[in-house]
Amino acid sequence: MSDTSETICSMCQLFYVNKWVLGTGGGIGIKQDNIAYISPSGIEKELLEPEQIVKYNIQDDTYQCGAPGLKPSACTPLFLELFKTLGASCVIHTHSINAVLCSMIYEKEFTIKDIEQIKAIPKGDGTNLRNVDTLRIPIIDNAPEEQDLMPALKQMIKDYPNACAVLVKRHGLFVWGPTPKKAKIYIESIDYLFEVALKMKELGQ
């Protein structure tokens, strides 16, 4: 049992309490050297145990499951692409209500500015955005299977090389960062900003 596996379980339990990963939805992947630790498919996140975490060997595309019948999250190809292309060490995928609603209300980008919490989001040059900057999160169309999102994800990476998140329309949110701690900070801040934006629209702001 590794600290990384325990980290994934702890985050899954927290995100379940937040109602971001209900009904087996969502997933988390953490990369350490050539091994990606990935939450398994079909397991309720609040019940996930460290020994159930899938260990995926990035070099030879093989994986080991801690229990019979388990397989990696359907998000695995997307996680691996973000690890490889952007150098991320942690990717979090959630199905939060705020994320789904924002993906439906906004067209190609979610944007927000002049909110203090924006300061928690990286700018892409080693610094963070300022509260007066505009946060832009791209939105891509959903697909029948997670792996079918790959072409849109690759195009998003080209169009938004400094992004740390992408919304999938009527589906959810992917967030990534250089460490699990950073990725957790980003996704908590972004979901908070989604909620602020939704309430602002309710108030006609």
Swiss-Prot record:
Binds 1 zinc ion per subunit. Pathway: Amino-acid biosynthesis; L-methionine biosynthesis via salvage pathway; L-methionine from S-methyl-5-thio-alpha-D-ribose 1-phosphate: step 2/6. GO terms for cellular component: cytoplasm. Its EC number is 4.2.1.109. The active site is at 116 (proton donor/acceptor). Keywords: Amino-acid biosynthesis, Cytoplasm, Lyase, Metal-binding, Methionine biosynthesis, Zinc. GO terms for molecular function: methylthioribulose 1-phosphate dehydratase activity; zinc ion binding. One of its GO terms (biological process) is L-methionine salvage from methylthioadenosine. InterPro entries: Aldolase_II/adducin_N, Aldolase_II/adducin_N_sf, MethylthioRu-1-P_deHdtase_MtnB, Salvage_MtnB_euk. It catalyses: 5-(methylsulfanyl)-D-ribulose 1-phosphate = 5-methylsulfanyl-2,3-dioxopentyl phosphate + H2O. Its main location: cytoplasm. Zn(2+) binds at residues 93, 95, 171. Substrate binds at residue 75. It is found in: Cytoplasm. Its cofactor is Zn(2+). The keyword Lyase applies. It is an enzyme of class 4 (lyase). Catalyzes the dehydration of methylthioribulose-1-phosphate (MTRu-1-P) into 2,3-diketo-5-methylthiopentyl-1-phosphate (DK-MTP-1-P). PANTHER family: METHYLTHIORIBULOSE-1-PHOSPHATE DEHYDRATASE (PTHR10640:SF7). Belongs to the aldolase class II family. MtnB subfamily. This is Methylthioribulose-1-phosphate dehydratase.
